[in-house]
């Protein structure tokens, strides 16, 4: 299982790289779960990241505005992101989610056929009126995405496992794999919860808080020693 770590600036990206993270995922925590950072931060992070190491960028907890979201996705791709992550926050149905992701995929793949598109839903979608997380694999498949992902929308200390049972998460992973895509799971995941994700054959685990001082995604800073500990668990 590979590790995605989400820095908010280049200094944190260096810590994540030195700690052994596999994917450097640029985000902006004050703007939400999948908060979008600025194009120059993505560009600077890409320049600071070793060649051959993948850079991801979240483009926000997005509304149902396909044109707006597609432009943001293209901006992230052009700024140097290899993975473009879209948080389907404001989509209320399969059709709305598909509409957003289909257009994003078209724009991103037109900019570079090796770019990777991630459709992200929320395990706690019921708290924010979002689309059912269990339809995300189907949305991702039908839109031509590469990865189906789950995160949590509300960052209040509750983790992915507080909102979905391990059985449901396993179902999500298996359906994603059945469609020939990779599966990524995140959501205030603690280091001791990572082995459970390995057991259900998750491909990518995403963290920020667990790699930050005081375990705080907002006030803390990513530290390479904490990243090293998480890498060790992922590799066991």
From Swiss-Prot:
EC number: 4.2.3.153
Pathway the protein contributes to: Cofactor biosynthesis; methanofuran biosynthesis
Single annotated GO MF: carbon-carbon lyase activity
Keyword Cell membrane belongs to the record: no
EC supergroup of this enzyme: lyase
Catalytic reaction list: 2 D-glyceraldehyde 3-phosphate = 4-(hydroxymethyl)-2-furancarboxaldehyde phosphate + phosphate + 2 H2O
Annotated function: Catalyzes the formation of 4-(hydroxymethyl)-2-furancarboxaldehyde phosphate (4-HFC-P) from two molecules of glyceraldehyde-3-P (GA-3-P).
Family the UniProt entry places it in: Belongs to the MfnB family.
Protein name, entry field: (5-formylfuran-3-yl)methyl phosphate synthase
Species of origin: Methanococcus maripaludis (strain C7 / ATCC BAA-1331)
Native organism taxonomy: Archaea, Methanobacteriati, Methanobacteriota, Methanomada group, Methanococci
């Amino acid at each position: 299982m590979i590790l995605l770590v989400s820095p908010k600036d280049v200094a944190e990206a260096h810590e994540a790289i030195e700690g052994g993270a596999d994917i450097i995922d640029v985000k902006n925590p004050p703007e939400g779960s999948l908060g979008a950072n600025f194009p120059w931060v993505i560009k600077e992070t890409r320049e600071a990241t070793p060649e051959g190491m993948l850079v991801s960028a979240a483009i926000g907890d997005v509304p149902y505005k396909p044109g707006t979201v597609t432009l943001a996705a293209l901006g992230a791709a052009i700024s140097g992101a290899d993975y473009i992550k879209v948080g389907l926050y404001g989509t209320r149905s399969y059709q709305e989610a598909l509409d957003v992701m289909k257009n994003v995929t078209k724009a991103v793949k037109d900019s570079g056929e090796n770019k990777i598109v991630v459709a992200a839903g929320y395990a706690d979608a019921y708290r924010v009126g979002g689309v059912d997380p269990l339809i995300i694999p189907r949305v991702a498949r039908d839109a031509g995405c590469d990865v189906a992902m789950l995160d949590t929308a509300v960052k209040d200390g509750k983790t992915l496992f507080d909102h979905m049972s391990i059985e449901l998460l396993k179902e999500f992973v298996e359906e994603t794999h059945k469609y020939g895509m990779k599966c990524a799971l995140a959501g205030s995941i603690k280091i001791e919860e990572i082995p459970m994700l390995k057991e259900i054959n998750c491909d990518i685990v995403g963290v920020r808080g667990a790699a930050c001082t005081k375990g705080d995604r907002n006030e803390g800073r990513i530290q390479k020693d904490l990243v090293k500990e998480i890498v060790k668990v992922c590799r066991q």
